[in-house]
Amino acid sequence: MFSHIIVGAAHGSTLYVGDMLFYAILFIVLMALIAKFAWGPVNAMLKERADRISNDIDSAEQSRIEAEKLAKQRKEALDNSHAEATSIINNAKDSGAKERELIIGNAQNEAKSLKDKAKQDIEQERADALKSAQDDIASLSIEIASKVIKKELDENSQKDLIDSYIEGLGDSK
């Protein structure tokens, strides 16, 4: 069909108007058929593809937003866990310091109590030793006095006499 056009163009001959008219009508009919039967489905396919691409883009955007939201939540959870861990550590340190102070205070109180009890025991032992020494001195003095003055005093009178003498010595110091 086109061969005579090509051959004619090569030989320098002119185109036939009838052929051109035929080709123009054929082109218009072909375009009408394409518009009637193929253009709708092709257009629908292109619209469907554009919608699918748009939906994919929207879905990807939504997924990106959700991923950012999850990342933000995880970061907040991580920050909260770091803050909570820091709080727990600080509370443990404070609790340990308070416990240490309590233990030290109790140990100091117990040491003071033991020291006071030891002082009381020492004072009691000293008083007992002093009383025992006074009794021994009184007995010894009675023996010496009875030998010196060669007379016997009853034991209570002698003790009173010696105690008053010892107290007099204690006051003079």
Swiss-Prot record:
SUPFAM superfamilies, sorted: F1F0 ATP synthase subunit B, membrane domain
Keywords for this protein: ATP synthesis, Cell membrane, CF(0), Hydrogen ion transport, Ion transport, Membrane, Transmembrane, Transmembrane helix, Transport
Topological relation to the membrane, as annotated: Single-pass membrane protein
Membrane-spanning segments: 15-35
Coiled-coil ranges per UniProt: none
Gene Ontology CC annotations of this record: plasma membrane; proton-transporting ATP synthase complex
Location in the cell: Cell membrane
CDD domains according to UniProt: ATP-synt_Fo_b
GO molecular function: proton-transporting ATP synthase activity, rotational mechanism; proton-transporting ATPase activity, rotational mechanism
NCBIfam families associated with the record: ATP_synt_b
Subunit field text: F-type ATPases have 2 components, F(1) - the catalytic core - and F(0) - the membrane proton channel. F(1) has five subunits: alpha(3), beta(3), gamma(1), delta(1), epsilon(1). F(0) has three main subunits: a(1), b(2) and c(10-14). The alpha and beta chains form an alternating ring which encloses part of the gamma chain. F(1) is attached to F(0) by a central stalk formed by the gamma and epsilon chains, while a peripheral stalk is formed by the delta and b chains.
Protein family membership: Belongs to the ATPase B chain family.
Free-text function comment from the UniProt entry: F(1)F(0) ATP synthase produces ATP from ADP in the presence of a proton or sodium gradient. F-type ATPases consist of two structural domains, F(1) containing the extramembraneous catalytic core and F(0) containing the membrane proton channel, linked together by a central stalk and a peripheral stalk. During catalysis, ATP synthesis in the catalytic domain of F(1) is coupled via a rotary mechanism of the central stalk subunits to proton translocation.
UniProt protein name: ATP synthase subunit b
Protein species of origin: Pediococcus pentosaceus (strain ATCC 25745 / CCUG 21536 / LMG 10740 / 183-1w)
Gene responsible for this protein: atpF
